[in-house]
């Protein structure tokens, strides 16, 4: 009995780790940002239920992803100690945990927000688990497919308030979609050999480092004008515009430096970490300089 009681915290910790809390928290911030920026009002209880249900949906997708990738995770330093590849948890537990979490979270999204937001959550879940995850072992285009569920949370936050998809919500979706590309290419560059050992493909493995660095620059060139849309749509004000331009040019400068100097893993890690600073700064500026709604 005592041994069983002592194991409960470990089991709980392992279940939580399946949801990838750090990734889920980042997604939750973007969903909350979409809710804050959307025109209209939402009650505090409904907003809380919506955010918790969004977190549950993301956690379910991550848990099912862990189930699917339990074999390849054994070959990567950052994943081999997860509950499934390490052998601490039976695969069936992770599978049913993910399914159960989704079964609770998606109806909660419909109740807390609306059916449209729940439908977007379902699209995010299915595209992440059934499309992006299996494609990772086959083609680098999986990155583009995975960009869709990764970009849906701010749109879900927007539709939770407005109950409609419009250009404002899609501008947030586009920003998140384009931001993910240099972010994930950077990871794939400095973890290239781990990807190879795990049997996964990526832009660097398929196209080479030079093409990968070039794609980072091209995606940043596309991202910068997209970040100006919230100002043009009167979602955010001039201070946001200044922050978006400054952050965008800084990010582009870092990308161009790596491309022209043909830099390697150190630059890729710097690009990865700056991408997190960039996204945090951009959404902070959006939140702080939100144009008041009447």
UniProtKB/Swiss-Prot annotation:
PANTHER family: PROTOHEME IX FARNESYLTRANSFERASE, MITOCHONDRIAL (PTHR43448:SF2). The keyword Transmembrane applies. It comes from Myxococcus xanthus (strain DK1622). NCBIfam families: cyoE_ctaB. It holds the Pfam family UbiA. Keywords: Cell inner membrane, Cell membrane, Heme biosynthesis, Membrane, Transferase, Transmembrane, Transmembrane helix. This is Protoheme IX farnesyltransferase. It is found in: Cell inner membrane. The keyword Signal does not apply. Disulfide bonds: none annotated. Carbon 2 of the heme B porphyrin ring is defined according to the Fischer nomenclature. Its main location: membrane. GO terms for cellular component: plasma membrane. The lineage of its organism: Bacteria, Pseudomonadati, Myxococcota, Myxococcia, Myxococcales. It is a multi-pass membrane protein.
């Amino acid at each position: 009995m005592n041994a069983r009681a002592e194991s409960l915290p470990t089991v709980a910790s392992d279940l939580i780790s399946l949801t990838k809390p750090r990734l889920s928290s980042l997604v939750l911030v973007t969903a909350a940002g979409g809710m804050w920026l959307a025109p209209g009002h939402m009650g505090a209880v409904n907003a809380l239920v919506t955010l918790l249900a969004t977190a549950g949906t993301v956690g379910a997708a991550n848990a099912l992803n862990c189930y699917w990738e339990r074999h390849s995770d054994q070959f990567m330093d950052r994943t081999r100690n997860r509950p499934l590849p390490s052998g601490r948890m039976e695969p069936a537990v992770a599978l049913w945990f993910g399914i159960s979490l989704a079964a609770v979270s998606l109806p909660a999204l419909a109740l807390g927000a609306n059916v449209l937001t729940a439908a977007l959550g379902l699209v995010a879940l299915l595209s992440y688990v059934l499309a992006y995850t299996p494609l990772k072992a086959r083609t680098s285009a999986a990155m583009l497919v995975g960009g869709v569920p990764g970009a849906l949370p701010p749109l879900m936050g927007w539709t939770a308030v407005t109950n409609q998809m419009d250009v404002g919500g899609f501008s947030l979706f586009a920003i998140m979609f384009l931001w993910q590309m240099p972010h994930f290419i950077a990871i794939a560059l400095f973890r290239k050999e781990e990807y190879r050992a795990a049997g996964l493909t990526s832009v660097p493995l398929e196209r080479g480092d030079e093409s990968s660095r070039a794609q980072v620059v091209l995606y940043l060139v596309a991202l910068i004008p997209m970040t100006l849309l919230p100002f043009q749509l009167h979602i955010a004000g001039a201070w946001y515009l200044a922050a978006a331009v400054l952050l965008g040019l800084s990010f582009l400068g870092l990308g161009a430096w790596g491309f022209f100097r043909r830099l390697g893993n150190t630059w890729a890690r710097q690009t990865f970490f700056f991408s997190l600073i960039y996204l945090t700064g951009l959404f902070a500026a959006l939140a702080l300089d939100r144009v008041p709604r009447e």
